[in-house]
Structure formats: structure tokens, C-alpha cells
Amino acid sequence: METGTFKVKSGLAQMLKGGVIMDVTTPEQAKIAEEAGACAVMALERVPSDIRAAGGVARMADPTIIEKIMKVVSIPVMAKCRIGHFVEAQILESMGVDYIDESEVLTPADESFHVWKHDFKVPFVCGCRDLGEALRRIGEGAAMIRTKGEAGTGNIVEAVRHMRSVMGSVRRVQSMSADELSAYAKEINAPLELVLELHKTGKLPVVNFAAGGVATPADAALMMQLGADGVFVGSGIFKSSDPAAMAKAVVKAVTHYKDAKVLAEISKGLGDAMPGLDIKQIEPDKLISRRGW
């Protein structure tokens, strides 16, 4: 089988469907995530809330940290590169990471272009706020899409906004007549062939995860009920008062997202969730979700 084709890469991402991907900064955290049932881990130097607090320029993690995490877990390991920084992506691919997240959580390296992901054999995940952004990233070769949300806030409101926007637009495309599709593709600045495919199949050609602000099992279940294929949890696990318990509860919430009784049971006794931020109190130029185009 030919490796590195879009079909192969998007197929690999499909294997994560129904799972939880957790941000980790140490091998110990990676083991906690794996034991809790995470389907993959995201290897980082700092979780998004710490990146937000520190300010300055956030770059790809030290390869040593990523390698240490890769050695201790058997589940897939993801790592982040900056938007447009194809050399960071080349480095991560050479290290053998399983997926690369071209992430707005890091400081963008290019304000005009994202990484051309078709040049890589490793699958990429990218964030989006709406259908146009999702289809532009898929057109560049992204094998997996996620909401941007507002990372590091513990506030789910932006992830909800982005998921509702994408899913609402998917339904809108389904209801369009064929002669409307070209104009709509132009309106949302998306590749026409992907809009046509969406109209035909009724769904995105790649998995669509929720990310950015997931802090509780209820948050995770909310995103699943809104149509997410799975959930990324960044600061929400290891900034909570009991990370191991929170990690297990979020995994169960994604599995049993429609069962309110199970959700009530697993939400008991978890201690404090991560401290949250009110999105309205963040200055517009400090909003991470606005990075990317």
C-alpha cells in the first residue's frame, strides 16, 4: 500500500474516532493519560494555559521532551508545529511522531501560508472556526480537523461556537441545489471540489474533533452531542486538582456522552476543574483562535 497518500493519512486519523487526545508535558503525565484510556497524547513543553500566561513566542517543543514521551507510551504521539513552519514539521516527521498539529496555540511563523501538508507522509491535524477554514486546511492536506475553541481558558464557549458553525454549514450545503455550490464555495473561500464532495456525502471527508476549553466530563459530552468525532483536552486534565480521576472521567464521558446518568456518576468527586477565563475579558489581539486564515 502506498504510504503518505491523503486516503491513507485520513484513514489513520479515522482510527482515533470516539477517543480523547490529552496534552502531556512529561513521561509521567503520558502514562497517566494512557492508563486513563486516551487514544493519543500531544507532547508539549507547556500546556496552553501556561503558554498563554507566559506570553512571548511559543515554538515547537524540545525534541528531547517529545522523544522521552514517545518511549514510554504505546498509543500514538502527536506534536505541535507553528502555523506555516514547514521546517518544524520536517523535524517532527523525521523523529517519527504519529501526527503533527499545525497549531494556533504556538506563535504563527507565517502570516500568509499554512504548511503544504501534501508534501508530508505523516498526517496533520489543523484547527478551524468555520466550514471555510476547515475545507481550506483539508485542501492543503489536513487529515484531521478540530475546533480551535480558545485554548488554555477552560471555557468551552468558543469550541461550541466553532462546532455549531461547522455542523450548521454542513447541513446548509446538503440542502443546496447544485447550481448554488460554486457561488457558496467562493463565498466561504473553500475548494469547490471539497464543497461538491460534502454536498454528495453529507459529511466532512476527515474526522472533526473538539478542542479548546474542554475542562470537565460534561464539556466533553456536550461537544460529542454537538457532532464532534472525539475530543482534545489540553490544560483541563493536568490543571485540575485530580488529573488521573479527571482523565478517566473525560474518557468515559466521550464513550457515554448520551447517557446523563453515567455522566452524573463520573462527575462526582473529581475535585476542582482548572481555573477558567471569561472570553469577554481577553483582549481581542490576545485571542489564540484568531490565528490562522
UniProtKB/Swiss-Prot annotation:
Functional note: Catalyzes the formation of pyridoxal 5'-phosphate from ribose 5-phosphate (RBP), glyceraldehyde 3-phosphate (G3P) and ammonia. The ammonia is provided by the PdxT subunit. Can also use ribulose 5-phosphate and dihydroxyacetone phosphate as substrates, resulting from enzyme-catalyzed isomerization of RBP and G3P, respectively.
Q: Which reaction does it catalyse?
A: aldehydo-D-ribose 5-phosphate + D-glyceraldehyde 3-phosphate + L-glutamine = pyridoxal 5'-phosphate + L-glutamate + phosphate + 3 H2O + H(+)
Active-site residues are K80
Q: What is this protein called?
A: Pyridoxal 5'-phosphate synthase subunit PdxS
Q: Tell me which residues bind D-ribose 5-phosphate.
A: D23, G152, G213, G234, S235
- Per the UniProt entry, the Enzyme Commission number(s) are 4.3.3.6
| Residues reported in the UniProt entry to bind D-glyceraldehyde 3-phosphate | R164
InterPro entries named among the record's database cross-references:
Aldolase_TIM, PdxS/SNZ, PdxS/SNZ_N, RibuloseP-bd_barrel
| Keywords associated with the record | Lyase, Pyridoxal phosphate, Schiff base
**What SUPFAM superfamilies has UniProt attached to this entry?**
Ribulose-phoshate binding barrel
Highest rank taxon of the organism: Bacteria
